[in-house]
Amino acid sequence: MFDIVTLARIQFAMTTVFHFFFVPFSIGLALVVAIMETMYVVKKEERYRKMAKFWGNIFLLSFAVGVVTGIIQEFQFGMNWSDYSRFVGDIFGAPLAVEALLAFFLESTFLGLWIFTWDKMNPKVHVTFIWLVVFGSMMSAFWILVANSFMQHPVGYVINNGRAEMVDFVAVISNPKVWYEFSHVIMGAFTLGGMAVAGMAAFQLLKKRDISFHKASMRIGLWVTLFGSIGVLLAGD
């Protein structure tokens, strides 16, 4: 039979893997939706508005599942790895708190405004909301990766009374590892979001459904995929 540590690892691994199905997809899809709505504002073509709303609904579902699984994961830091949390919590908790109080609330606030103000705000103002959601999602990723980079390359801390204590917050957020991780994760997310949209649109084109709508969706998805793929190549080199 499995021991307690192995069971904790299995549970945490399952939560993390499931959570990370939705995080990069949400980040990448947010960019695609923002580009679609920007095209609507610039070109005044109704199909781009419909595209932004359609793919935006899929983004909302992914975002919601990502939030729920992320909350479960944070509970497991304390429940599955309580000794580790006690040892490194002074450092590990800081970026997670900043992510929740700054990036997540920014993202959630403007996502709510974006959802409920389609016919109430000037289109140029409304498109700003989704771009702020994109920015907020990237900021969330950054602060999570600050915590992760500390685990890979600990900096800015001292051991005091058997606990790791932060002595240099700037060193923690400027950890060289975080910038490699951030660029690689974000570009990978853009690749995933673009490819998912392009793939689903291509399937609909094969079914001869709403040709103009899905052809434009696939085109934008492929451009985002190209951009993300080049970024992943450069970041992972």
Identify what each model region corresponds to:
Residues 1-237:
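Polytopic transmembrane helical bundles with strong interfacial aromatic enrichment
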